[in-house]
Swiss-Prot record:
Record GO cellular component, one term: cytoplasm
A biological process from GO: phosphatidylinositol dephosphorylation
Chain positions with Phosphoserine modification: 8, 613, 633, 647, 651, 907, 1062
Name of the protein in its database record: Phosphatidylinositol-3,5-bisphosphate 3-phosphatase MTMR3
Keywords, comma-separated and alphabetical: Coiled coil, Cytoplasm, Hydrolase, Lipid metabolism, Membrane, Metal-binding, Phosphoprotein, Zinc, Zinc-finger
The organism of origin for this protein: Mus musculus
Positions that bind Zn(2+) 1: 1123, 1126, 1147, 1150
Length: 1196
């Protein structure tokens, strides 16, 4: 009880230990320009030269006009003032940041603040990782859930030593043993507590050897080749000194490693030969007694000494001159005369001081002008690639000795914690495919770098009072660079991708996690970092698809032999060069492709007039200036920019409720409003590579990429096979459609309002790839008196009251055609673009009114105009209502509260079509004729279609249904989480929302989007190759899902036919069922039997099972360590969710659907797993059964 109370007190006092600091603003109008992590508190917010600068206890954030800088404080190595007004920040990962200030005093103030912030901590608790963990635990404690294990690494890390001994197959009976001589670190503080040594070496001999080796780092075995039994061992240098000291126990131990290796290999060979002889020679009686005895020989420890061992290779990472010079300090190297049957090789690797100078030269080079004339020669002069080459050659020498020559290897340098882990970890990575997996790589880092005492605190500069700059050196970064070189040479051999390594580089220095704190395991145990901080492996876990290499093949080369020449190595641009820093799309960095047919006299497309704010757009609109040339660098358009790069990781049809046309897909060119062919989406700033990727996505999937960053793109309309059309209805909820009246030109002119004439006159005929409406729709709503609509917060109660009290202003047939999901029609964010105009209030009330009437009234459809684009085949298309951006939602919210006035009429803001209205109406009215049959099944689910309406200027208006970009928290609160226009989100936000649990904040002009940053507060890193691979994979999965649904539909229809024939044979049909054949052959719209919704299929008669009436028992939380569906481990971000139907525990991605569960008395949409969702979600019946009343089903 006392211990429980003590723990509860610790939980209560957790965030009192790390209190938030008071925010100091240089300007009262400034806001924090980023979303804070748990435990993060912003201390200063101010203005720099054309930038906003903010400083917290975790990061420095500088938001420029068209880019941003986001760097953890511990990643900054130094700050100095240059040119009086400029701060020069040097980072530990080779980056350099420059920030200009308007005044000298302001520059000096920020210089002092930054120098105080980056100073090495006086105590380790001052590092942010402790505050981050404490606040995370505080949040989880308030949720009354146990999440402490989510901050921990997996079992493969915590039990790594035992698992590795078993996996590598050490013979622990005769050749090797596990020594506990270093228990509680009483022998060596920088060594692990368990060591593998030859079986006949006693602990007393080990103590004697420890006195002879530097820092008592005795030779210990760390790897065994599973085929030939050769081992790799590591140690510190021998302390020979100028006196030439010897140690007999040390010489005996080194030779015993080779003998134990020979004994182990003989034992393994005998076991293999025994299995082969029993398998290949079942009648093995012909073998002689000598051969039989030798095949089963199991030599003891004494007999193994008589075996002839291979010559042991002692690899000294230093040069011979450096090794001899170390004798003056009491060190030295092994003398071949004293170590018989051993070979000593010197590799000539540079020490940490040379590596540090080389890295500083590289950093200076990377921060120069982007294209220096002597780039290659200057890069060669840094010798950075040369040092990488020597390191790779050293590791390759170990691989040759172990794999080809079957020789044991002993590796050391001076102290054994810098160059030694570089060589042995790289050699193990080349030798063993397990270490090239995500889990294996984590084990490799933990064992060779953390357990064997690499001095991360001193080398990275975040230790307590670690002011000695001579101790700092990017040793671990250099090793990760070598791993990156291997990834380039063997792209299919690594399970993790480059983003994994970039994240590891960032968090080596960031101190967000406690994995790389302190200098050794003993210090980490004393400071309790494992219990008081989060592990970086909780982020870089194996289940995180963002870090998986889609080219990985487990059947690739078992042993890698890389090319180590300098000419084959490449600079790691993702880490060293400043190019990957997040930036907003600018016209300088990416100009759209030229549009065919444009006039040469038009202004160039690469430079567009710049409008800075929402108010400027209003003023421009009032001055009748064309608005279609607005730049995408404006903050109000920036919100969704980063999702363009990140959404490429998903396919353009990654919506849960969407179908992919697997057959008969026809590629037809998109057309701009001006008639030009649209080849790529506008507004891409990462270069033309992403444009190419986007085009490739369209070619791969046959579906246009959804709208990004406020630009509208004309979608392609695809035809779908009948089965795909039929199955598409099973995934979508009912869609309520309305019909717009047929209006002639005179009627249009009579209803023309001032806003319509304004927009029709202000829109140019030719555009450069942007939709005409992308900027014109930015204007605020205005009433008849041209007053802006006040911004209010939406109230669901008021909406409901208005819906009940509103009388119909116009008949049903006069209402505009809008595609609104029935389950989401009450969401204020789902009000479509088409309703924008000075007389918008009536249309909103129509939507609310018809939400109630849609259950009983006949559904009316419109037919799109096929003549204007040449892409329609006369089939009905269902429009999907696009969602306004977040900056515009408050205005739409306020519209929902306005009352209807009888005198108001409905008007639309529309863009002109390329064809005149008279040509567009050849045989078919542009707004469509009244349809009597429900053709919803003919529309492929989840496809955005083109809508056309007549406009006062005599053109046909093109409307594209854009996909909604709601925040994830908004989606989860809605009842249509899986609808096609609500589901599009990138995979990275899953970790953010489950990890942080923070409320979302609205963006302001000074507040950039969170999408610029990753879930850990670091800049987003994107790999275009991996993005394209994810598109291909997602497309393949969608095709498989489509085929599965088609097969299920066919199976259901066959079962239905079988049941029908069986019932008819038995004569058991009732009156209701026997009326179905009449309705199937009756095409009369007024047929009563076709309106019946009581019988959807003959297969609806099911026997009631006893278990259907029982409540499902939930699986307890503490019994579920992995997701029931995908088997991914639960951790800090992967939360546990119960399925309300089956009771099993799933991760958020496997349990993200909502549907009513009547069997559990849950009549509101509740969270269920995917399998239960497919069984509970009502599927469409036979394609011939077309109902006027939509089947009541939720779209989530």
């Amino acid at each position: 009880m006392d211990e429980e109370m003590r723990h509860s007190l610790e939980c209560i006092q957790a965030n009192q230990i790390f209190p938030r600091k008071q925010l100091i603003r240089e300007d009262e109008n400034l806001q924090v320009p980023f979303l804070e992590l748990h435990g993060e508190s912003t201390e200063y917010v101010g203005r720099a030269e054309e930038a906003i600068i903010a400083l917290s206890n975790y990061r420095l954030h500088i938001k420029f006009k068209e880019s941003l800088v986001n760097v953890p404080l511990q990643l900054i190595e130094s700050v100095e003032c240059r040119d009086i007004f400029q701060l020069h920040l040097t980072c530990k990962d080779c980056k350099v940041i420059r920030c200009q200030f308007p005044t000298f005093e302001q520059c000096q103030d920020w210089l002092k603040r930054l120098n105080n912030a980056i100073r090495p901590p006086g105590k380790i608790e001052d590092l942010f990782s402790f505050a981050y963990h404490a606040w995370c635990m505080e949040v989880y404690a308030s949720e009354k859930e146990q999440h402490g294990d989510l901050c921990r690494p997996g079992e493969h890390v915590t039990s790594r030593f035992k698992n590795e001994v078993e996996r590598m197959g050490f013979d622990m009976n005769n050749a090797w043993r596990i020594s506990n001589i270093n228990e509680k670190y009483k022998l060596c503080g920088s060594y692990p507590q368990e060591l593998i040594v030859p079986a006949w070496i006693t602990d007393k001999e080990l103590e004697s050897v420890a006195g002879f080796r530097s820092w008592k780092r005795i030779p210990a075995v760390i790897y065994r080749h599973q085929s030939n039994g050769a081992v790799i061992a590591r140690c510190g240098q021998p302390e020979v000194s100028w006196w030439g000291w010897r140690n007999a126990d040390d010489e005996h131990l080194v030779q015993s490693v080779a003998r134990a290796c020979a004994s182990d290999s003989q034992s393994s060979i005998s076991k293999v030969s025994t299995r082969n002889s029993c398998r290949d020679f079942p009648n093995a009686g012909d073998l002689s007694d000598v051969e039989f005895d030798s095949s089963l020989s199991n030599t003891s420890g004494a007999e193994s000494l008589a075996l002839q061992p291979q010559k042991l290779l002692i690899l000294d990472a230093r040069s011979y001159a450096a090794a001899v010079a170390n004798r003056a300090k009491g060190g030295g190297c092994e003398c071949p005369e004293y170590y018989p049957n051993c070979e000593v090789v010197f590799m000539g690797m540079a020490n940490i001081h040379s590596i540090r100078r080389s890295f500083q030269s590289l950093r200076l080079l990377c921060t120069q002008m982007p294209d220096p004339g002597n780039w290659l020669s200057a890069l060669e002069s840094t010798k950075w690639l040369h040092h990488l080459s020597v390191l790779l050659k050293s590791a390759l020498l170990v691989v040759h000795a172990v794999d080809r020559d079957q020789r044991p290897v002993l590796v050391h340098c001076s102290d054994g914690w810098d160059r030694t882990p570089q060589i042995v970890a790289l050699a193990k990575l080349l030798l063993d495919p397990y270490y090239r997996t995500i889990e294996g790589f984590q084990v490799l880092v933990e064992m060779e770098w953390l357990d064997f005492g690499h001095k991360f605190a001193d080398r990275c500069g975040h230790g307590e009072d670690s002011d000695d700059l001579n101790e700092r050196c990017p040793v671990f970064l250099q090793w990760l660079d070598c791993v990156h070189q291997l990834q380039r040479q063997f792209p299919c051999s690594f399970e993790f991708n480059e983003a994994f390594l970039v994240k590891l580089v960032q968090h080596t220095y960031s101190c967000l996690f406690g994995t790389f704190l302190c200098n050794n395991a003993k210090e980490r145990g004393e400071k309790q970092t494992q219990e008081r901080t989060c592990s970086v492996w909780s982020l870089l876990r194996a289940g995180n698809k963002a870090f998986k290499n889609l080219l990985y093949s487990s059947q690739s080369e078992a042993v890698l032999y890389p090319v180590c020449h300098v000419r084959n190595l490449m600079l790691w641009s993702a880490v060293y060069l400043p190019c990957p820093s997040p930036s907003t799309p600018t016209d300088d960095s990416c100009a759209p492709y030229p549009v065919p047919g444009t006039s040469p006299d038009e202004p160039p497309l690469s430079r567009l007039p710049k409008t800075r704010s929402f108010d400027n757009l209003t003023t421009t609109c009032e001055n009748m200036v064309p608005l279609a040339s607005r730049r995408s660098s404006d903050p109000s358009l920036n919100e969704k920019w980063q999702e363009h790069g990140r959404s490429l990781e998903l396919s353009s049809f990654a919506s849960a409720g969407e179908e992919v046309p697997a057959m008969d897909s026809l590629r037809k060119p998109s057309r701009l409003l001006g008639g030009a062919e649209l080849s790529v989406a506008a507004g891409v700033a990462e270069g033309q590579m992403e444009n190419i990727l986007q085009e490739a996505t369209k070619e791969e999937s046959g579906v246009e990429e959804p709208t990004h960053r406020g630009h509208t793109e004309v979608p392609e309309v695809k035809e779908e096979a009948p089965l795909a059309k039929e199955s598409s209805m099973a995934a979508e909820g009912p869609v309520v459609l309305y019909q717009e009246p047929q209006l002639d030109d005179a009627t249009l002119r009579s209803h023309q309002g001032p806003s319509l004439s304004l927009f029709s006159q202000g829109i140019p005929e030719h555009q450069d790839g942007h939709n005409v409406l992308s900027s014109s729709l930015q204007a605020p709503l205005r009433g008849e008196d041209s007053q802006e609509v006040p911004v209010e917060q939406p109230q669901v109660e008021n909406i409901a009251e208005d819906r009940e009290n509103v009388a119909p202003a116009v008949p049903v047939d006069a209402k505009v055609g809008l595609g609104i999901s029935q389950s989401s029609s009450l969401l204020p964010s789902q009000v479509p673009f088409e309703t924008r105009g000075p007389h918008i209030n009536n249309s909103v009330h129509m939507l609310l009114e018809d939400k109630v009437k849609s259950e009983s009234g006949p559904q009316l459809h419109h037919r799109p105009c096929p003549a204007s684009s040449g892409r329609f085949s006369g089939k009905d298309m269902l429009p999907v209502a696009p969602e306004p951006r977040s900056a515009e939602r408050p205005q739409w919210d306020s519209v929902l509260h306005r009352t209807s006035s009888p005198g108001n009429t409905l008007s639309l803001l529309q863009a002109p079509c390329a064809l005149p209205l008279d040509k567009c109406r050849q045989g078919i009215v542009c707004n469509g004729a009244l349809e009597t049959e429900n053709k919803a099944s003919e529309q492929p689910a989840g496809f955005d279609t083109l809508q056309k309406y007549p406009t006062p200027n005599g053109h046909c208006a093109n409307w594209e249904a854009g996909r909604s970009k709601d925040s994830l928290s908004h989606q989860l609160s809605a009842t249509s989480c899986s609808s096609a226009h609500l589901y599009s989100r990138n995979l990275h936000h899953k970790w953010l929302n489950s990890h942080s649990g923070r409320p979302s904040t609205t963006s302001s002009p000074d507040q950039p989007s969170r999408s610029h940053l990753d879930d850990d507060g670091m800049p987003v890193y994107t790999d275009t190759i991996q993005q394209r691979l994810r598109q291909i994979e997602s497309g393949h999965q969608q095709e498989v899902e489509t085929l599965k649904k088609q097969v299920q539909e066919l199976k259901s229809r066959l079962e239905s036919q079988y049941l029908t024939s069986s019932l008819r044979f038995n004569g058991d049909f009732g009156d209701e069922v026997t009326s179905i054949p009449d309705s199937e052959s009756n095409l009369d719209q007024n047929c009563v039997s076709r309106c019946s919704t009581e019988i959807f299929s003959e297969a609806s008669w099911e026997q009631v099972d006893k278990q259907d009436t029982e409540m499902t028992r939930w699986l307890p939380d503490h019994l579920a360590a992995h997701c029931y569906a995908c088997d991914s481990a639960f951790w800090l971000a992967s939360r546990k969710h119960h399925c309300r139907n089956c009771g099993n525990v799933f991760c958020s991605s496997c349990c993200n659907q909502k549907v009513p569960v009547p069997s559990q008395q849950l009549f509101e949409p509740s969270r269920v797993c995917k399998s239960c969702y497919s069984s509970l979600h009502p599927t469409s019946s036979s394609i011939d059964l077309e109902l006027d009343k939509p089947i009541a089903a939720t779209s989530n």
